[in-house]
Amino acid sequence: MSLFSAQNRVPLTVPGGVAAQPSIQVDSNLRRWFSRNLGLWRSRRQYTFSDDQVLHLDMNLKMEAFAHPEVGESRYRFSWWSDQEDQHSDEFFARKPWFERSGVMEATLWGHQLQRSRGYLTGDPVRTRLRQVDEHETILESHYQQWDILEHIRLVDQDRYRYRAIYSWENGDLSIVEHHHEIRMSDPL
């Protein structure tokens, strides 16, 4: 059985059809790992597509924590944007118009899952499974629409740098491989 078969998909509804939010205690290690990612980051990216096309892109990322989340929750806002004057950005978005030049996503940490208000490749809500490799690395696994996405995020050198490797399968075929080298520009306030 494939890791990305339909049986491994995470449902967007609470099992049993219950509409209420589940009462889950957030893992303190994951909460700590997410707090280490707060702040402004400069992201230098390489995308390799299934047609062997390789494109580069520079982005800015900002991760913030909500000041007053509900009891037992950890909530975050992720914002991303590219510099308007960047030649690589113009070329990238002209060739791949389904990617967004800027956007905002909100997310809630529930145990070992992250409920996102949207995905990077869709505007629909997405539930992501989290696995912590060690205190510096977490793996995110998402399934939505025709996409299966595996993302490795590793904090490096006292959290001054971050490396992300993202593999995206479309309808079971590896379609996009991304490598992001990120530099912390500012710590959270």
Kindly label every feature range from the protein language model.
Residues 2-22, 85-189:
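Calycin-type beta-barrel ligand-binding domains and close structural analogs
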Residues 1-102, 184-189:
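Amphipathic/hydrophobic helical signal segments and adjacent flexible N-terminal regions
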